[in-house]
UniProtKB/Swiss-Prot annotation:
Mn(2+) 2 binds at residues 55, 193, 282. GO terms for molecular function: GTP binding; metal ion binding; RNA ligase (ATP) activity; RNA ligase (GTP) activity. This is RNA-splicing ligase RtcB. It catalyses: a 3'-end 3'-phospho-ribonucleotide-RNA + a 5'-end dephospho-ribonucleoside-RNA + GTP = a ribonucleotidyl-ribonucleotide-RNA + GMP + diphosphate; a 3'-end 2',3'-cyclophospho-ribonucleotide-RNA + a 5'-end dephospho-ribonucleoside-RNA + GTP + H2O = a ribonucleotidyl-ribonucleotide-RNA + GMP + diphosphate + H(+). Ligation proceeds through 3 nucleotidyl transfer steps, with 2',3'-cyclic phosphate termini being hydrolyzed to 3'-P termini in a step that precedes 3'-P activation with GMP. In the first nucleotidyl transfer step, RtcB reacts with GTP to form a covalent RtcB-histidine-GMP intermediate with release of PPi; in the second step, the GMP moiety is transferred to the RNA 3'-P; in the third step, the 5'-OH from the opposite RNA strand attacks the activated 3'-P to form a 3',5'-phosphodiester bond and release GMP. It comes from Mycobacterium tuberculosis (strain CDC 1551 / Oshkosh). PANTHER family: RNA-SPLICING LIGASE RTCB HOMOLOG. Its cofactor is Mn(2+). It is an enzyme of class 6 (ligase). GTP-dependent RNA ligase that is involved in RNA repair. Joins RNA with 2',3'-cyclic-phosphate or 3'-phosphate ends to RNA with 5'-hydroxy ends.
Amino acid sequence: MQVVNVATLPGIVRASYAMPDVHWGYGFPIGGVAATDVDNDGVVSPGGVGFDISCGVRLLVGEGLDREELQPRLPAVMDRLDRAIPRGVGTAGVWRLPDRNTLQEVLTGGARFAVEQGHGVALDLERCEDGGVMTGADAAKISDRALQRGLGQIGSLGSGNHFLEVQAVDRVYDPVAAAPMGLAEGTVCVMIHTGSRGLGHQICTDHVRQMEQAMGRYGIAVPDRQLACVPVHSPDGQAYLAAMAAAANYGRANRQLLTEATRRVFADATGTPLDLLYDVSHNLAKIETHPIDGQLRSVCVHRKGATRSLPPHHHELPAELAAVGQPVLIPGTMGTASYVLAGVTGNPAFFSTAHGAGRVLSRHQAARHTSGEAIRASLAKRGIIVRGTSRRDIAEEKPEAYKDVDEVIEASHQSGLARKVARLVPLGCVKG
């Protein structure tokens, strides 16, 4: 029903799309994609982005570090990561911002500002969506409450399904694409999944309320109040997009800071540098140009729980990846595989694909009959080390709470949304 409701939004073009990992969400389904024609009454809807604005994934690749080489040191590495990575609801981050002026630099500069402050290298930005910074951000469109929530959380995982996972490449499907990505069987990687924390949540909350009140002024009626929306070109629409871009930059800076904390752990424990393969959001609305009915049109592409998947030779790709397409990072669960895919030509859903396994059990249902300690012990028997803030958090994220990620990936591959490059298996997980 949510996919159908999205199809009624003013200005929608082509279709309302559901990705293979689709499940129920706020307004839009999680795993939903829709584009609206911004010059023909197209709207923007915060429900099409979600509360965790710019929640996304980045993958770090261990330069010359093999799974067998890491194995004896893995417990020590996980203990160090456990201490180095802040997480949990309301947790303070690794970077203590001195004042709101510095926060505003983060909101407008994203990962680029973090790198300029010494938290990374210039090459990192070449491997980030939009070069690590989304233009159009305006902190003046953000409430004091949202700013206050963002001030102390930069550089932290948060809670829920967010994580930092040490992985190893288990299988390579496409050696030609895997080579420039630095992926070979046995290669150690680190996947980071988090977003814009309390700041993004508050921005969504604030602008949903504003749009609920504003829709009448624009003559808009929606079948579900959670689909509150306004025209992209309206003052309300521009205010949301400016605030959303600021949250996107916060999320990108957040992952950049966690990257540096992780690099320090690996440098100290293994002497191995970690190179950034790619960083991409899966909760975002972006103004893009796409062919619609034979003409190039400016559209607002909502991707909620959906990963951008650019094809080979797209102008936004770094030169060394242009021939193979954008790396698409799709995490599984604590006990299952994650995947690296690549974008393909002809993707019908505005170059979008899945973002994860997709929930089948609510958090309450997942935790009802299982203890976090039992899950931790079960994973330990399989050689997977788990570090979590609470037993309930671990129970809520048990593998059985999600769809079979292998089936989600196969559906993405077979339907022409992306192609398989490599399969990664978990070695250790720091849970948010």
